[in-house]
Amino acid sequence: MKNIETDYLVVGAGAMGMAFADELLMRDRSVRIVMVDRHATPGGHWNDAYRHVTLHQPAAFYGVNSEPLGPGGTYLASGAEVLAYYEKVLAKWEKTGRLKFFPSCEYVGENRFRSLMNRDREFSVEVKKKTVDSTYMNVTVPSIRPPQYEVAEGVRLVPPNDLSKLSETPSDYVVIGSGKTGMDAVLFLLKEGCDPEQIRWIVPNDAWLIDRATFEPDRFTKLGSQLSEIVEADSLDEIMQALDAQEKLLRLDPDVWPSKYRCATVSREELAQLRRVKGVVRMGRVRKIDSNVITLEEGTIPTGPETVHVDCTADGLAKRPVRPIFEGQSITLQSIFVCQQVFSASFIAYAEFRLADDAKKNALCRPIPHPESVPDYLVTATRTSENLGACLQAFPIWFLRSRLSIVNYFGLSAMLRLGLRERKLQPKANAKAKALLPSEFSE
């Protein structure tokens, strides 16, 4: 076993691990970091994603603080661009000698890791400061795990990665799953020339969708957050009705009221394409696929040997139990701004750099679990507003200069106007949320 020494041991070279390490290396010119990942290259789940994947939110707010990604605006970087970007960032920091990356290695606990390529290569790390777990959010994609339903022998079932590799043209397609991956699969099939009638789409639950245009700074400052709708409503349904009327949130089908919210983001053009598919099956989750029938929770639909079934059911971001982010010699990276993992990780690193006391750091960096249901929308919206207000008050200059922060694109005057508006609404919104969902705010 080889012994090595470092200040920080970062487990995972995915988006959150890279954002954390980059911020710390940028702020502290003496810090040393060892980074370990099971993949051969940095980028985490991007290494396993399908070829046609792109960012769902603008590249301007993604990646790390020290390096721009894409040309700016609402540009959506491809998966290949993201992977090349992370390799560039890694190479930059490796050249300084302050970051050492150990690819194709598995962390086994107690500051030890081993090579996945050579069983005789094991390492023990003397960590001078802290061990950082950037894998806790547990991002999964369909290509790295089997489907969670029975599949009979001979059924043509593929992950989205294999759609571009089909050797025989199928008669039709069944896309299973309604999250971001399912939407991407449908959009890919349509873009490649499939007729909408060739596609059946199993949508277990409809979810509210975010309009990507709301990330444009001008529109964001005009619309603000959703606090005004929360304050003025008397029920959760009224909140969602108001957001629907203002088109701050969108629906896949205007005639179906969503029951889920998972931060899925689409453009108006993409939504129009998705609505071309009329063969939407709303019978719950798939239980089993046989050679001629698909069994769902609430019924069955026919299938056939020439049908390609596309598994898009991996829970990309699970709703994990909340843990304190700072605990002695450990840091567990989690979102502190809803659905903004890399921005959260970068700020957590900045808090680690600026503050010495764990209690103060945890007071600023309160974890927000990934939302799943409509009630989660209300909880995460109000808690994000609280966190953002506290963090902005503590370190306003960081927010103005961070490329991962939408505040960076506002300018000072717009930020002040928005901040004043939100500060007035926040106490009322928090009180309303606690009244509507007391069990979620019991602490």
Task: Describe these PLM feature segments.
Residues 2-16, 169-179:
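Beta1/beta-strand and adjacent pyrophosphate-binding region of the FAD-binding site
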Residues 20-28, 162-209, 343-393:
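Rossmann-like dinucleotide/flavin-binding elements
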Residues 68, 72-141, 263, 270-297:
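Feature captures the FAD/FMN-dependent oxidoreductase FAD-binding
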Residues 9-11, 124-140, 173-176, 304-315:
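Short hydrophobic core segments
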